[in-house]
Amino acid sequence: MRVPAQATIAVLASAVSSPLNDPQIYDLGKLGWTLSSPALNRTVPGHLPSQVHLDLLRAGVIDDPYHDLNDFNLRWIADANWTYTSDPIRGLGNNTHSTWLVFEGLDTFATIKYCDKQIASTNNQFRQYAFDISEAVKDCTADPVLSLNFGSAPKIVDQIAADPASPQWPFGIQQSYEYPNRWFMRKEQSDFGWDWGPAFAPAGPWKPAYLVQLSSEQNVHVLNTDLDIYRQGQINYLPPDQTQPWVLNASIDFFGSLPSNSSMSIAISETNSGAELTTQSLRNITILNGSITGVAVLKDASPKLWWPYGLGEQNLYNVTITVSDGVRSLARVTKRTGFRTIFLNQRNITDTEIAQGVAPGAHWNFEVNGHEFYAKGSNLIPPDAFWARVTTTKMARLFDSVVAANQNMLRVWSSGAYLPDFMYDLADERGVLLWSEFEFSDAMYPVDKAFLDNVAAEVVYNVRRVNHHPSLALWAGGNEIESLILPTIERSYPDQYAKYVGDYETLYINLILPLVYENTHSITYSPSSTTEGYLDVNLSAKIVMAERYQNLTEGHYYGDTDYYNYDTSVAFDFSQYPVGRFANEFGFHSMPSLQSWQQAVDPEDLHFNSSVIMLRNHHYPAGNLSTHNFHNTSMGMGETTMGVMNYYPVPDKTDPIANFSAWCHATQLFQADFYKSQIQFYRRGSGMPERQLGSLYWQLEDIWQAPSWAGIEYDGRWKVLHYVARDIYQPVIVSPFWNSTTRRLDVYVTSDLWEPVSGTVDLAWMDLSGKPIAQNARTPKTAAFVVGALNTTKIYSMNINERALPDPKNSVLILSVQAEGHLPNSNKKSTLTHQGHFTPVFPKDLMLVDPHLELRYNAKTLTFTVQAKAGVSLYTWLDYPAGVVGYFEDNGFVLVPGQKRDIRFVMQEDKTDGNWVQDVTVRSLWDQTTKT
């Protein structure tokens, strides 16, 4: 057993800057900690912040939780209670007015004791907790030890579910993945399993904690700050008037006491240059329920605007808020922010818009600083099953990959955790809008008073915490409740539908909506991620927002869409894709690379249908705690198999590991092409009657090494999908739309720029050896075009049967666009290029030719040069070895014979001392057909 030291904890620099009477802030993470449990026959070192699995891993008690089938093998950890115990706390001030414990996050069911006296119990992972322990400190006669006992979340929610007073829902409504009853807890819902991740149900002090001592009665500690910047007169659900001055509303949450004559002032300066924008006093000061609030109208200030990536600069400002009593500073807080308006437009289509060709219905698109724009991006899931080990460095790499793929928005999927501030900081700096959601998904939830009160505190804290970030784009109530759960109830239990609509409105409209509106003027709220929008908003009505639900009119378009179709036979039939105003979820799963599999799976299990590979695939989920989910997972594996077999060469390599790797790559090819087909379709919709202005695919990244919908693997390696996203999210693209039934090919140019763009598209038919087809198959070699702002235009249409193609199986059409135009908020004209291709048959039926790819590396320029010597190289793929994290600036492209492509590798981490370069390889679709 570890003998505790007599710890004297260090005093931190105060978060409340005041030279006269700072509180003393002690970082509890500086203490020594131990971890114990009845399930463990010894005590091991603990840490804060941390989680139980991580401390057991550090102590050598368990293997890597991500290894093999440890998500099953380590369930004993989630089933046990665990206690974190501090070393005795010495050095606390004796002449203090009050002493407080502040926890930024406890996961989840925790009992807190100090000096063997119970202080409090908690039941919400997402809340900040502050407890006055002044009396416990003064009365302490035993060892001044802090203990945090974490109960087993799976067992506790099972007990809640078994209580006769707890709500019960009809069969088939609540979606379980592994552990049941997740809806009874305010904890990361995916901790109990999801179809892309494991169910570890972790516990522990997952965020920092502090002990704070106030030296006098008029002394405060800042807990949270709500900085709201908006246009004067702005209302959440209406478009802001861009001619109005900026308003700054500052609200500081604190404990302690402020004099009634307290004043507030602000100083705003540019973050980069330090240039002062303005300083002024706030008006209408109120002190109520532990918050001090004031407002200022910035009439004479002209800040530079903050814009999303690709639309302008990310101008940032530091706002310093000072609270004083007229003589001295009592509190001072600095927040970095930006000046922008962001608005989700759900208003009805006007007669003028209908006359311009927009289909009737309602809008569903975002506007930034008064401008419509096309939202290009993906869905962010939890980056790790254990948040305590998520680092700023790794997330910076992830966000760098987001903007490298030309994405300007991420939907932060509900039922993970609210993102930490540092991730919003990264988004602020890079121009990534974060559509944020409250943590509810794919289930109905309790609506009793205790549950609602708990949620209310969670909502208020998190809305206020992140409101200053210009990257914050939206608050949504939850995931797929309106689009999936309520319709399921209506179909299966129509007599109970009204009751559950009422429960839905109680939580997402009556409770959450007013709390959002009370704490921010600048952000729109939508009760559900996928929704048909609202009929009306009336702030004085009993139900403030009247949702449209299924009150739809034929021929009208409303709301956003999600789309999952695992029948791969229709994957590239774009008539199957939903027509709507915005696509917020769509996708298909694929395997990670061999390099990622090797991080978690033993060599003997590296084949497509091994038990380990199959059981790490959670699509389809077991729906319970079964460890032999072969029936459901085989359906998911079968879908990926059919996606390959229907369209691509089937790998059949002699070496089993090489064959497994080729199969993994093949599933990624299908996934990437399927997403490309959909994104092209949705982007084309910007110029169609639906006026479609957003596509966010499912999903950005992996939580672990397993089959999933991700485009970025767990360690940061890009799948084929992310390279395709980088390509197809360029500002101006050329896209082929092929109808295999009518044999008609339409070629479109789509632009998301804010002004018309003109240019040309080159159309070049050739056979797969690279030889041009005679007379270019009766196709014009060049087509000129003009495409309107945020629009699309058809530049050519042909029937393949009428083309002079000697053999469709030996034909490829290369499409190359070159356009001139201004990027948003740029005075400089840019040349914009993009290349696409089309084959009249699917890749599996092509008469492929070995392109004899040659790869060279120039150490001086740090570039790779790829050349096809003998044939057309389709899906040209550069791959790098393990030990490196980064991405190629281009990948998955087409090369024609004689063409060279110079490609730089963007290094994010190198553990090979530069030796990785020797193991970079290149392959093409041809290599999928070979035995070696």
Curated annotation (Swiss-Prot):
Sugar-bearing residue positions: 41, 81, 94, 249, 261, 284, 289, 318, 348, 538, 551, 609, 624, 632, 659, 739, 791
Keywords, comma-separated and alphabetical: Carbohydrate metabolism, Glycoprotein, Glycosidase, Hydrolase, Polysaccharide degradation, Secreted, Signal
Signal peptide per UniProt: 1-19
Record keyword Hydrolase present: yes
Name of the top EC class for this enzyme: hydrolase
Cellular component GO terms held in the UniProt record: extracellular region
UniProt-listed SUPFAM superfamilies: (Trans)glycosidases, beta-Galactosidase/glucuronidase domain, Galactose-binding domain-like
Stretches of the chain forming a coiled coil according to its record: none
GO molecular function, one term: beta-mannosidase activity
Pfam families named in the record: Glyco_hydro_2, Glyco_hydro_2_N2, Ig_mannosidase, Mannosidase_ig
Substrates-to-products reaction catalysed: Hydrolysis of terminal, non-reducing beta-D-mannose residues in beta-D-mannosides
Subcellular location: Secreted
Principal cellular location given in the protein's record: secreted
UniProt GO BP: glycoprotein catabolic process; polysaccharide catabolic process
Pathway of action: Glycan metabolism; N-glycan degradation
Protein's UniProt keywords contain Secreted: yes
E.C. number: 3.2.1.25
InterPro entries: Beta-gal/glucu_dom_sf, Beta-mannosidase-like_N2, Beta-mannosidase_GH2, Beta-mannosidase_Ig, Galactose-bd-like_sf, Glyco_hydro_2_Ig-like, Glycoside_hydrolase_SF, Ig-like_fold
Active site positions: 480
Subunit and interaction comment: Homodimer.
Similarity comment text for this entry: Belongs to the glycosyl hydrolase 2 family. Beta-mannosidase A subfamily.
Role of this protein: Exoglycosidase that cleaves the single beta-linked mannose residue from the non-reducing end of beta-mannosidic oligosaccharides of various complexity and length. Involved in the degradation of polymeric mannan and galactomannan.
Protein's name in the database: Beta-mannosidase A
Gene that specifies this protein: mndA
